[in-house]
Structures are given as structure tokens and as C-alpha cells.
Amino acid sequence: MKTLSPILPPSLHTGLVALLLLSVSPAIPASRGAAPAAGTALVAASGTIRIIAGLSAPLTDEKGEKWLPSRDFLDGDTMDRPELSIANTEIPSVYRSELFGMTRFVRRIPNGNYLVKLHFAVTYEAIDGPRQCVFSFDVEGRSFKDFDLFVRAGGALKAYVESIPVAIRDGDLEIKFTALSGNPTISAIEIVPQP
């Protein structure tokens, strides 16, 4: 077996070490939509994983909880509207950004039971009534068909949380999204370990 030793200028050695550390970091997989390597689950000190879907930087909410950005989504675009006032929540900052048009989310987590909380809000000003933001999603085999976000949230600029108990047996939490009328959209995901 041969050992390869790269020859790099001293200024790059630190960057290489940081890059190597980043590549094994559980916080963000290498590319959007790619499942992280085996054994790279990110679990906060509390055990809860908090993912902010529409931002590329971490967010600390009004309760002091830290939400980390994710590259666990396949497809989609982001929008941040920091000036919005969001009702029905104590953590409005979590709902001011969104990921929309995504098709899939896959996150490597340890096997076990979890409560998956999907955080939604209608923040796009062109959506002003029912049937304008309708999509379906599937969380580990549990299907939510014809999910009308405007109706579920009770209108625009209102937070809505869908909580789904799941049992992970293959090391991956998978959520599939299908557009029906408008784009699927999501603000954040919480993955809470259960006994």
C-alpha cells in the first residue's frame, strides 16, 4: 500500500486541514441534495436538530435556540424577508426565510424514534388565498396530500407547524415534496429525539 503525501506551500497547509475537517464535519454535507457520509449526524447538545431552510448562515431565534443551515435539500431556491411580521409564534425569525421548489430532503441521523416538526408560513405576497400554495409531501412513508399552506396556517404571515412522529431504521430521514399549485415551501425543520 502506498501513502500519498501532497506537497503544498506552507500557507495552504492550514487551509487543507480546515478543508479536511469540514469534509468530515456533520453539520453540512458536501453538496446540496447529497446524503452525508455514514455516521455524520448532527445532534445538538439538547439532542434536537434545528435546520433553517432558507438561510446560508446560522440563526439564533428569539428563545436563544440555534438553527443551522442545511444542504440536505435537493433543488429549490431561497428567499429571506427579514422585515416581515409573523403571527402565531414566539420565534418569528425562523419563518422570515424560506426554501421553495425543493423536491427532497435527506438527513443522516441515528436510528430511533423522532418527532419531526415542519415549520411553514406563507410569506410570498402573491399568495393571498386558498389553492395558491398547494403541495404534497411524504415524511418517512407518511403522506400529506393536497397540503394547502394558506388554509392550514389560517392565512398569510402566520406560522404553522406540522408535527410527525417517525421511526428511523435505515439511518436516513427522508422527506419528499411534490408541487401541485405553486411551489412547495418550508421555513425550518426540527428533529426531536423521542424515548
Predicted regions, residues:
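Compositionally biased, intrinsically disordered or flexible polar/acidic segments
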Residues: 27-195
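Bacterial N-terminal signal peptides
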Residues: 11-25
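N-terminal secretory signal peptides that target proteins for export/translocation
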Residues: 1-10
